[in-house]
Amino acid sequence: MNRRSKWLWIEPITGSRKRSNFFWACILFLGSLGFFLVGISSYFGENLIPLLSSQQILFVPQGIVMCFYGIAGLFISSYLWCTILFNVGSGYNKFDKKKGIVCLFRWGFPGINRRIFPRFLMKDIQMIKMEIQEGISPRRVLYMEIKGRQDIPLTRTGDNVNLREIEQKAAESARFLRVSIEGF
């Protein structure tokens, strides 16, 4: 939901709380928990989970490896759940014509840099860039080129946005900021 007036435009950015992230975090957690429990079951010689038989798995080569993969998967799963819990990457883009300032706000992991809040002057914005790569894994990213700085992404690099939407968003941004558009 964009909030837009003649002088102010606030565009919310979704973070890591997406259905796909919930899906993969659940799958990874359940799979790695299964691996870990089968490895532990092979050590004790009993089935801790009735559905997962560990009778033919020897502990020394296979059980240890399954425990290791299970623990590694649980660590990766906990990282995914932390990104979902803290909603890393969410925030907003705020364009204020009255003050002549562009503010980009994003949430990060807890700590000193939890709030990422760079500010730029509108007069320093040179153009809006679109990076479009087609192929097996298409990449469509919108950048803001600022004088004396690196290009700042306005869209997430992992978002699967179709070409029409990214072009429309680039046109809206360029029209509001009164800058040109470049595609590469």
UniProtKB/Swiss-Prot annotation:
Membrane topology according to the record: Multi-pass membrane protein
Domain of life the protein comes from: Eukaryota
Pfam families linked to this entry: Ycf4 (PF02392)
Transmembrane segments: 21-43, 58-78
One GO term of the biological process aspect: photosynthesis
Classification via InterPro entries: PSI_Ycf4_assembly (IPR003359)
GO cellular component terms given for this protein: chloroplast thylakoid membrane; photosystem I
Main location: plastid
Keyword Phosphoprotein: no
Cell location: Plastid, Chloroplast thylakoid membrane
Repressor found in the keyword field: no
Keywords: Chloroplast, Membrane, Photosynthesis, Plastid, Thylakoid, Transmembrane, Transmembrane helix
Protein family (similarity comment): Belongs to the Ycf4 family.
Known role: Seems to be required for the assembly of the photosystem I complex.
Protein name: Photosystem I assembly protein Ycf4
